Amino acid sequence: MSIVFQFFLIALVLFSLLMVIGVPVAYASPQNWDQSKPLLYVGSAIWAILVVAVAILNFLVI
């Protein structure tokens, strides 16, 4: 169970770093807003799912 928790935690950290770089770039380019809007919504949903998964796994591991 600890390995699964560590995998999800690393995925959350790396995805958060990706979002920190990607979201401002997507907002700064108005010509691609229609293309990047669904990608931002999907990325935000994945990030929220990872946060909930890490919280649940943290409860189970500790």
Curated annotation (Swiss-Prot):
The chain crosses the membrane at residues 8-28, 41-61. GO terms for biological process: photosynthesis; photosystem II stabilization. It comes from the Bacteria. GO terms for cellular component: photosystem II reaction center; plasma membrane-derived thylakoid membrane. It is found in: Cellular thylakoid membrane. Gene3D superfamilies: Photosystem II PsbZ, reaction centre. InterPro entries: PSII_PsbZ (IPR002644), PSII_PsbZ_sf (IPR036512). The keyword Transit peptide does not apply. Belongs to the PsbZ family. May control the interaction of photosystem II (PSII) cores with the light-harvesting antenna, regulates electron flow through the 2 photosystem reaction centers. PSII is a light-driven water plastoquinone oxidoreductase, using light energy to abstract electrons from H(2)O, generating a proton gradient subsequently used for ATP formation. PSII is composed of 1 copy each of membrane proteins PsbA, PsbB, PsbC, PsbD, PsbE, PsbF, PsbH, PsbI, PsbJ, PsbK, PsbL, PsbM, PsbT, PsbX, PsbY, PsbZ, Psb30/Ycf12, peripheral proteins PsbO, CyanoQ (PsbQ), PsbU, PsbV and a large number of cofactors. It forms dimeric complexes. This is Photosystem II reaction center protein Z. It comes from Microcystis aeruginosa (strain NIES-843 / IAM M-2473). The gene is psbZ.
